[in-house]
């Protein structure tokens, strides 16, 4: 389960930010693409033990909010950007099959919520 390693790396990054800014992080918002190879349920399950590995870090009560990113493509002909949750091989606008993937394989820390200290 590589989600535990990902959750641990995320916790380490949040701790670094927390220490640099003297902040307590209450929630981390991440975007996880459907082609990222990360199972959102497994990542959510791994978050609590990963955060607990750093006692006194302030992450003990930090929530993890996972937003799922669909596949997003741009048509090379008409430049339309569209999302879908299945394999699609043509533009819904002009029916061209020359598509460029814009997103869907990312894992990004989008934002954090910080408590007043």
Regions found by a protein language model. Give the residues of each.
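Long, charged N-terminal interaction/targeting segments
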Residues: 1-60
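Short loop/turn motifs enriched for small/polar and acidic residues
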Residues: 31-35, 67-71, 112
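Short, flexible, mixed-charge glycine/proline-rich loop motifs
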Residues: 63-70, 80-85
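Short cysteine-rich clusters marking metal-coordination/redox-active sites
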Residues: 74-78, 91-94
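Short functional micro-motifs and their immediate structural scaffolds
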Residues: 83, 96-100
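Cys/His-enriched microdomains
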Residues: 73, 89, 107
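Short metal-binding segments enriched for Cys and/or His
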Residues: 101-111
């Amino acid at each position: 389960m590589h989600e535990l390693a990902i959750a641990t790396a995320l916790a380490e990054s949040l701790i670094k930010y927390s220490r640099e800014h003297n902040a307590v992080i209450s929630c981390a918002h991440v975007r996880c693409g459907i082609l990222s190879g990360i199972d959102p349920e497994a990542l959510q399950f791994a978050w609590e033990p990963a955060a607990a590995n750093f006692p006194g870090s302030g992450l003990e009560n930090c929530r993890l909010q996972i937003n799922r990113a669909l596949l997003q493509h741009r048509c090379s002909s008409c430049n339309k950007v569209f999302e879908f949750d299945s394999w699609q091989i043509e533009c819904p606008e002009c029916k061209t099959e020359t598509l460029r993937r814009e997103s869907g394989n990312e894992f990004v820390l989008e934002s954090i919520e910080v408590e007043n200290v």
